[in-house]
Swiss-Prot record:
One of its GO terms (molecular function) is 3-dehydroquinate dehydratase activity. SUPFAM superfamilies: Type II 3-dehydroquinate dehydratase (SSF52304). This is 3-dehydroquinate dehydratase. PANTHER family: CATABOLIC 3-DEHYDROQUINASE (PTHR21272:SF3). GO terms for biological process: amino acid biosynthetic process; aromatic amino acid family biosynthetic process; chorismate biosynthetic process; quinate catabolic process. Substrate binds at residues 74, 80, 87, 101-102, 111. Its EC number is 4.2.1.10. Catalyzes a trans-dehydration via an enolate intermediate. Keywords: Amino-acid biosynthesis, Aromatic amino acid biosynthesis, Lyase. It comes from Ruegeria pomeroyi (strain ATCC 700808 / DSM 15171 / DSS-3). InterPro entries: DHquinase_II, DHquinase_II_CS, DHquinase_II_sf. It comes from the Bacteria.
Length: 149
């Protein structure tokens, strides 16, 4: 079974209670459960990990090589600041789909810049928790023989 890592960055452990008007009321546990179930329905094994620490996220990306075939990444605020995450993604040569619950392009100007997007397969934002499932679908299609490039 194809294995995918779903990686959540800083403050995503507070989903459901942190700014629900922006991020919704779905908790991280609910997101993870939905990702695992959705992945199974697509023939994917899904592992989920959250950290508030940039180095731990870099370590998780490095450790994914040889274990997982792709990564769904919501880097949170590190999207806009972390060259380390960008370099980690480039170094493992795995397809990454960047996810954001809110539409980062419709928010504050500093959120319009993503250091992840240039090294990602694609970006999904503004669809709430559904964005994670869309990202899993995108990776499944990309990794299928028909989606190979």
């Amino acid at each position: 079974m194809t294995s995918i890592l779903v990686l959540h960055g800083p403050n995503l452990n507070l989903l459901g209670t942190r700014q629900p008007e922006v991020y919704g009321t779905t908790t991280l546990e609910m997101v993870n459960s939905a990702c695992i179930a959705h992945g199974q329905s697509r023939g994917l094994s899904v592992a989920c990990l959250q950290s508030n620490h940039e180095g731990a996220l870099v370590d998780a990306i490095h450790a994914a090589k040889g274990v997982h075939r792709g990564i769904v990444l919501n880097a949170g605020a590190y999207t806009h600041t972390s060259i380390a995450l960008r370099d980690a993604i480039s170094s493992v040569e795995l397809p990454v789909v960047e996810v954001h619950l809110s539409n980062i392009h419709a928010r504050e100007a500093f959120r319009h810049v993503s250091h992840i997007a240039p090294v990602a397969l694609g970006q999904i934002c503004g669809f709430g928790a559904q964005g994670y499932l869309l990202a899993l679908d995108a990776l499944a299609a990309h990794l299928s023989p028909e989606g190979a490039r």
